[in-house]
């Protein structure tokens, strides 16, 4: 424990959200419009700031709920960067289908609870059915309408989401996005 006092350095907290205030629909001329990111942030890291919103990177826990419900794309989940998530999704589904796989069901799970549950199923049971493809993400709540529709476009028959009990308070935005995708 005394060795800790000699440790010197920096800690860099990741910035989970990229925010483009130019396309934010929060407010204009003092008239409030969209508040979806504020309403769905479980940590309170997003606050109104005039005609835009302010993201506090030190409070943000990186759940991605804000990005998944943002109608304009002003809030974008930054991890992984760019199109990495969609490229992984497309590659996995194309490979499965090209190998003769049928009726792919995508199981979206986080890297903590989800991976542990899938491992437990493999150790203590028969594992996942052959047509259920696990897809690991940083936080399940980061997926939104764009991801759900892309999964269907890339060949997924269904998208299943494994959400840990500790995240049950963060599911409202995700459920709204899933209902919208189902309607489309």
What would you call each of these model-derived segments?
Residues 147-184:
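Cofactor-cradling patches in redox/metallo enzymes
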Residues 1-40, 44, 103-119, 161, ...:
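Ferredoxin-type iron-sulfur electron-transfer modules and their immediate structural context
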Residues 32-56, 61, 65-83:
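Iron-sulfur cluster-binding cysteine motifs and their immediate structural context
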Residues 15-21, 48, 125-132:
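Gly-rich Lys/Arg/Thr-decorated short loops/hinges at beta-loop-alpha junctions or inter-strand turns
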Residues 132, 140-144, 148, 153:
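Non-catalytic interaction/regulatory modules that flank or connect domains
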Residues 106-141:
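Mobile, glycine- and charge-enriched loop segments
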Residues 77-101:
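A contiguous, basic/glycine-rich beta-loop/short-helix subdomain that forms a polymer-engagement track
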Residues 25-26, 48, 62, 77-78, ...:
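Flexible loop/turn segments at secondary-structure boundaries
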